[in-house]
């Protein structure tokens, strides 16, 4: 098996296939074997798992996933990698590579088709520019037991942030609504070719079987969260007033106070149970109109 984390092997592959890294696709490939090994270990992947991998690149993580998992389905956008992957991971009979845009894939249908008797998990080294939409799609698909991603460290910290922290955001709430995130380890820039300008980090999200709070309507919940973070320096009352035109400020004040929230509070200080209580109260008030 070709060691695609060996710089000499990487250079040979680059020369053999005339491959050029694409900045527009955010291609930064791993060149250190310990990284994919630790990702698989931290992901808790075993032979009972079926894994969707997004963006295999040259296949270093794919190799480790195939060793550990029952089956791996890798989704790759760049068709110029087809001959490279045939050489680097072609020997694995538990691997299927689909050349497609992961953002256009019906993930629940794919998981149902490929992993009928396996516990589905997702694993990805995500390009920085598409981290949020891909991770959101993985979580909203509600078809995985866990999702493990390598992202920019700043994004990893945002995913794991606590209410009131400077990096707490609507994306934090979304990630924690669907899963329980754990920051596994950092990955220095020198572990990639070409080297990015930032440090990366690996985060594992154990997907929740049930929401962390009672929520009457997901749409209203996330509408409330988006409104709360739309203007970080404004009070929650002003943020809600700007986004919920169907309510006057006096009515919004009464709704907030009914769930124990002062009108002067800022949205970024609310945790998920508080957002749940507020969104439920807003929904009930709207339905009562």
For each predicted feature, which ranges?
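Conserved catalytic loop of SAM-dependent methyltransferase domains
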Residues: 230
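Short helix-coil junctions and helix-kink-helix linkers
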Residues: 241-246
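Primarily EF-hand calcium-binding motifs
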Residues: 259-261
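Short amphipathic alpha-helix in the helical subdomain of ABC transporter nucleotide-binding domains
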Residues: 249-252
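Catalytic cores of RNA-modifying enzymes
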Residues: 1-227, 254-257, 266-268, 277, ...
């Amino acid at each position: 098996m070709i060691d695609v984390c060996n710089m000499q092997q990487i250079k040979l592959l680059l020369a053999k296939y005339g491959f050029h890294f694409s900045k527009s696709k955010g291609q930064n490939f791993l060149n250190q074997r310990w990284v994919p090994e630790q990702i698989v270990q931290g992901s808790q992947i075993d032979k009972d798992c079926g894994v969707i991998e997004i963006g295999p690149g040259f296949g270093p993580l794919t190799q480790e996933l195939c060793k550990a998992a029952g089956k791996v389905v890798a989704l790759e956008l760049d068709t110029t990698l087809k001959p490279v992957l045939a050489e680097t991971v072609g020997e694995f009979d538990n691997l299927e590579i689909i050349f497609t845009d992961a953002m256009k894939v019906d993930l629940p249908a794919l998981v149902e088709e490929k992993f009928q008797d396996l516990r589905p998990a997702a694993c990805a080294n995500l390009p920085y520019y598409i981290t949020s939409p891909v991770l959101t799609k993985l979580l909203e698909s509600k078809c995985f037991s866990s999702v493990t991603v390598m992202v920019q460290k700043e994004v990893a910290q945002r995913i794991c942030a606590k209410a009131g922290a400077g990096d707490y955001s609507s994306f934090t709430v979304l990630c924690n609504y669907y899963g329980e995130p754990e920051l596994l380890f950092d990955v220095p820039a020198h572990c990639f070719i070409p080297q990015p300008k930032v440090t990366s980090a690996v985060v594992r999200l154990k997907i929740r079987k049930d929401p962390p709070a009672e929520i009457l309507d997901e749409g209203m919940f996330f509408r409330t969260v988006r409104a709360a973070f739309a203007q970080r320096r404004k009070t929650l009352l002003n943020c809600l007033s700007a986004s919920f035109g169907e309510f006057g400020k006096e009515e919004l004040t009464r709704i907030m106070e009914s769930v124990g929230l002062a009108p002067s509070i800022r949205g970024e200080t609310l945790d998920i149970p508080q957002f749940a209580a507020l969104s439920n109260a807003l929904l009930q008030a709207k339905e009562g109109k």
